[in-house]
Amino acid sequence: MTRQTLGWGVAMVLATALIGLAEPKGPTVTVKGEAVDMWCYMEGGDHGPAHKTCATMCARAGNPIGIVDAKGDIYLTAGLQDHQPARDLLLSKMSEEVTVTGTLVTKGGTKMLFVKSVK
């Protein structure tokens, strides 16, 4: 085995270990609620079917997406894979009731749901 091959092997093992460390730590939960664009919801409380077009445009533009449950609790969403936003999973469901399963992490009063699946 050459030195270069050994170096690449060690690098791959370290990279794999670091990816494992990047997984969010928390319980797996299922949340039912409405998919909202956080800008409009936080600024003016806008949500529901009448807000679907605006919510979709805002989310497409890059605004964060959240889930608001029946109690009014807000879950900010993020993608679980490759540190991507959850936009691809939720964009077509803006202003609709969804069931989201993922890893819940709470820090400083903020609830972040790392999304695994959306129904």
Where do the model's predicted regions map?
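Intrinsically disordered, low-complexity segments enriched in polar/charged small residues
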Residues: W8-G9, K116
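OB-fold and OB-like single-stranded nucleic-acid-recognition modules
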Residues: G20-K119
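Positively charged n-region of N-terminal signal peptides that target proteins for export
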Residues: M1-G7
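Bacterial N-terminal signal peptides
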Residues: G9-G20
